[in-house]
Amino acid sequence: MRVASVLASVAVLQLFSALAFAATDASAPDVAALLKRLDEQEQRIKSLEERLALQQRKPAATGGASVSTETSNPASPASVNPTPGTAAIAVAPAKAGPQGFAIQSPDGANVLRFRANLAFDGHWFSDQSTPATADTWLFRKVRPYIEGTLDNTYDFRLMPDFAGGKAIIVDAYVAARIAPQFVVQVGKFKGPVGLERLQPDQYNRFVELGLPSSLVPNRDEGAQLGGDLFGGIVGYAVGYFNGVTDGASTDAAGTPDQDNDGKKDWEGRLFLQPFITTDRAYLRGLGFGAGGTYVDITGSAANALLPAYRTPGQQIFFSYRSGATATYADGRRERWAPQLYYYVGPFGVLAEYVQSSQQVSRQVSASVRRSGQIDNSGWQTSFSYFLTGERELYNGLTPHSTFEPGKPGIGAWELVARYHELRIDPAAFAGGIESFSDPAVSARSARAFGVGLNWYLNQNIKWMLDFERTRFEGGAPADANRADENAFLTRFQLVF
């Protein structure tokens, strides 16, 4: 220790001083007295060393807790040469990178990350039927959030959204990773059903999700048990949730983020990646499975608990009858969603089918009440290909280069294409004026073809440009077809 070395040096100097004094002064003490004096000096040094060791074990600044001297900059002068006589103060490592800004404890067991998801969109239409007001710029997502881990076990996230001039809670949950096979999650988060819906937002290949994603739940409140078995070959999740209508989140309910019907949804998903551990690269990217939900609910004309469906350009093309004689949910709601993806090299494909069945009723008059079951379905197949050779993945991307003005590198460029459709059960339009949906307003089906170009400037910034052409069956007066929708959609997205 540096202080001990200084004390030893002082003792040596004192010894030489005493010997010099004895050699030059006739009245100097005898040898026995000199040895006694040296022994006293040695005891004094030993006492000082013990006090120094005690001070380093119990720094006053931490109330006796052990403190690490590791800092985020180990080569800094303060960490290499602390001020003598002061206790070392530990600095938790701070990091900044593609995954956001993070602060963590010296042992890495506790981490707090500051992140954000910002999406600024442009919607432009070249058809003659979409209202001119639909041509617009808008913030689709404004989501600063925090997430982290406690004790290497408990993950958490709190994510609000300020887009659209309002504030909502998008995610708010805690997940306990008891083991890879057992993860308990509680709070508000995405339900375990739709494949595209479960994909992290920053890895969606199109500006808007496909039509079948309109049939699966978005974010719900509840508790879920899930995990990975056999090294990730089998993934499962089962949960008990408040329940939401097709494509919706609990913040869109009549009373936001509260149970609006008193009934609970069972939701579950089983997903297999049978070759994830194999050496065959052309098989590792194959995954398939199915998700589903079940509940028995009863709404009312005032609280119908039924969805409306939108086009890729976010225009409503189907809704149930509303008003005093509105159609409302009245019985079982079941969803079934088989799904598949395959990624190899720069190529990827994602496909899914969804069927949503809902028993409904409508009090047409005081004496007439109609009931029935509506089975709506949708499917999609989407393709993606990296022109710059990056590896396609369901939930990740690392560009081979980044785009910085004045430097080499063009980022990652990706071509995407998809076909998707949503079909409404003909039973929704049966019965004339007593039907559950008005055929002069709502379409019987929507079929869309989309192409797009994505530019990943780096891992955090993405620019997307899509064109979606949607054709309809029905949806206009006199049983005519609603005019086609031609939508140009763009998004500037920042995620860190």
Please identify what each model-predicted range represents.
Residues 42, 49, 196, 208, ...:
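Acidic-residue sensor for enzyme active/binding pockets
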Residues 8-18:
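Bacterial N-terminal signal peptides
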Residues 91-92, 134-135, 212-216, 259-260, ...:
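Short Gly/Pro-enriched turn/cap motifs at secondary-structure boundaries
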Residues 56, 166-168, 247-249, 360, ...:
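Extracytoplasmic/secreted cell-surface and envelope-processing proteins
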Residues 130, 282-284, 292, 300-496:
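Outer-membrane beta-barrel pore domains
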Residues 1-8:
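Bacterial N-terminal signal peptides that target proteins for export
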Residues 96-299, 375-407, 412-431:
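Outer membrane beta-barrel
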Residues 21-119, 271, 387, 391-402, ...:
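N-terminal periplasmic/intermembrane-space "pro-region" immediately following the signal or transit peptide
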